[in-house]
């Protein structure tokens, strides 16, 4: 079970949003590269970046900060990025810069052909991000709720060849209210590709619960507000996960 620290970028700074609200953000760092190094030094084996401005603008905005993170730790661990990725040229540029994976969210839901083309052109590097409330997929920085069922879309995207799915429960993200284990497992059971949980991780009990369902296909969890607020010690959490699944993955 991988614990994956999230670095959410807004105006070049490291922030956390509450339930995806750009007007309700807390700044946790002015130096994204230093933040990335902090998590790698604490034992992170993958990083999750989000270009928040990009997600709302529909194009890359925080490229300078992203490149600084890649320069700092890209040679050490894989880095995945979501937010504002809407065309193949952007994907190619990011992968050339040194990212390991790009995460396609809104664009995958609105334009499935784009996701299919991305999987064809950049096989092994495309992750789909599905954000949902009550099982229904949301788009556009969580501002629009669709009628699509998460499981149905995920199966379709699996057929396209995506490398994995990041599943975010919008109602819990940034609230420290616990991972929605039931919904995450339901999705993982419907797929053969890995599912990464996101939204609500708050403490060691959540890690215990996730490790208990790792065999269902839940391979990792995005760590956000909890590791910044101090509610969860990241290094201790990853150590616990390693112990529970029988050693380092």
From Swiss-Prot:
Residues annotated as the enzyme's active site: 8 (proton acceptor), 131 (proton donor)
Gene Ontology terms for molecular function: 1-(5-phosphoribosyl)-5-[(5-phosphoribosylamino)methylideneamino]imidazole-4-carboxamide isomerase activity
Pfam families per record: His_biosynth
EC number: 5.3.1.16
Pathway(s) this gene product operates in, as recorded in its UniProt entry: Amino-acid biosynthesis; L-histidine biosynthesis; L-histidine from 5-phospho-alpha-D-ribose 1-diphosphate: step 4/9
Catalytic activity: 1-(5-phospho-beta-D-ribosyl)-5-[(5-phospho-beta-D-ribosylamino)methylideneamino]imidazole-4-carboxamide = 5-[(5-phospho-1-deoxy-D-ribulos-1-ylimino)methylamino]-1-(5-phospho-beta-D-ribosyl)imidazole-4-carboxamide
Alphabetical keyword list: Amino-acid biosynthesis, Cytoplasm, Histidine biosynthesis, Isomerase
Gene Ontology BP term (one): L-tryptophan biosynthetic process
Keyword Isomerase applies: yes
Coiled-coil residues: none
Location relative to the cell: Cytoplasm
Enzyme class: isomerase
Keyword Amino-acid biosynthesis: yes
Gene Ontology CC: cytoplasm
Chief location of this protein within or outside the cell: cytoplasm
Entry's family note: Belongs to the HisA/HisF family.
Protein's recorded name: 1-(5-phosphoribosyl)-5-[(5-phosphoribosylamino)methylideneamino] imidazole-4-carboxamide isomerase
Gene name of the encoded protein: hisA
């Amino acid at each position: 079970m991988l614990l994956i620290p999230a670095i959410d970028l807004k105006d070049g700074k490291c922030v956390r949003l509450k339930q995806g609200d750009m007007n309700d953000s807390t700044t946790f760092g002015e130096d994204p590269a230093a933040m990335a190094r902090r998590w790698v030094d604490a034992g992170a084996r993958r990083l999750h970046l989000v270009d928040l401005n990009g997600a709302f603008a529909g194009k890359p905005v925080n490229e300078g900060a992203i490149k600084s993170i890649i320069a700092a730790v890209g040679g050490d661990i894989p880095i995945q990025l979501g937010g504002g990725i809407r065309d193949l040229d952007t994907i190619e540029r990011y992968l050339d810069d040194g990212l390991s994976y790009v995460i396609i969210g809104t664009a995958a839901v609105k334009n499935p052909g784009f996701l299919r083309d991305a999987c064809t052109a950049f096989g092994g590097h495309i992750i789909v991000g599905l954000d949902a409330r009550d099982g229904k997929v949301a788009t556009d920085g969580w501002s629009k709720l669709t009628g699509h069922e998460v499981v149905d879309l995920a199966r379709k995207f699996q057929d396209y060849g995506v490398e994995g799915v990041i599943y975010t429960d919008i109602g819990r993200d940034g609230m420290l209210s616990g991972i929605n284990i039931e919904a995450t497992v339901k999705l993982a059971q419907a797929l053969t590709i890995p599912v990464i949980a996101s939204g609500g991780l708050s403490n060691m009990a959540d890690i215990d619960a996730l490790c208990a369902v790792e065999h269902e296909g839940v391979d990792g969890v995005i760590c956000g507000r909890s590791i910044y607020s101090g509610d969860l010690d990241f290094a201790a959490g990853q150590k616990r996960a390693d112990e529970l699944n029988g050693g380092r993955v």
